[in-house]
Design a protein with these regions (language model features):
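Histidine-anchored nucleotide/phosphate-binding helix
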Residues: 19-21
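Membrane-interfacial amphipathic helices and adjacent loop/beta segments
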Residues: 34, 39-45
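Active-site-adjacent pocket-lining segments in enzyme domains
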Residues: 3-12, 26-36, 52-168
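Short gly/ser/thr-rich secondary-structure transition/capping motifs
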Residues: 45-53
């Protein structure tokens, strides 16, 4: 069974996170939500959720997919976590799927050097967080093992794309 990790940090966009979690779980993917800023996470719109695990509990596991939802300051909270960055880079370097939506492609993935210009999308206005990278306006983009999506309106399509990539 494929295994996915979804990062949850205070200030994240919960509809992006939970839409992807729901779609992946319906497809039989073993999904873990991991609290980065605490076991209970409060979204950018004050929705509170309890993560399945704390990030520190699963930091040494191997993942078929890791996913960073957007939202502010959720994306900056993810980007400031050395454990999040390490898991993303480890997953990417193993050739497994790394995915981000909304602000996170620019804020989280941009500084890690895993996005190529013209081969990623992000929420309009977040491009400045990743100087030197040209983002495109498409809804969902796959570039090798990096999958990015533009905004909450694309979360369902992103989830379906991730299933097709994981399950072939």
């Amino acid at each position: 069974m494929k295994k996915a990790l979804v990062f949850l940090a205070d200030g994240c966009e919960m509809c992006e996170a939970l839409c992807v979690v729901d779609v992946l779980r319906r497809a039989g993917i073993n999904v873990f939500t991991a609290g980065v800023t605490g076991e209970r996470v409060v979204s950018s719109h004050n929705v509170e959720i309890k993560a399945d695990v704390m990030l520190s509990e699963v930091k040494n596991e191997e993942w078929d997919l890791v996913f960073a939802p957007g939202g502010m300051p959720g994306a900056t909270n993810l980007a400031s976590s050395s454990i999040v960055n390490s898991i993303i880079l480890d997953t990417y370097n193993k050739g497994n799927i790394v995915s981000a939506i909304c602000a996170s492609p620019a804020v989280v993935f941009g500084p890690l050097g895993i996005i190529k210009s013209g081969k990623a999308t992000c929420y309009p206005g977040c491009e400045d967080y990743a100087p030197g990278i040209e983002f495109v306006s498409d809804g969902v983009i796959v570039d090798g093992n990096v999958v990015t999506a533009k905004s909450a309106g694309w979360a369902f399509d992103l989830g379906l794309k991730l299933i097709s990539l994981l399950e072939g």
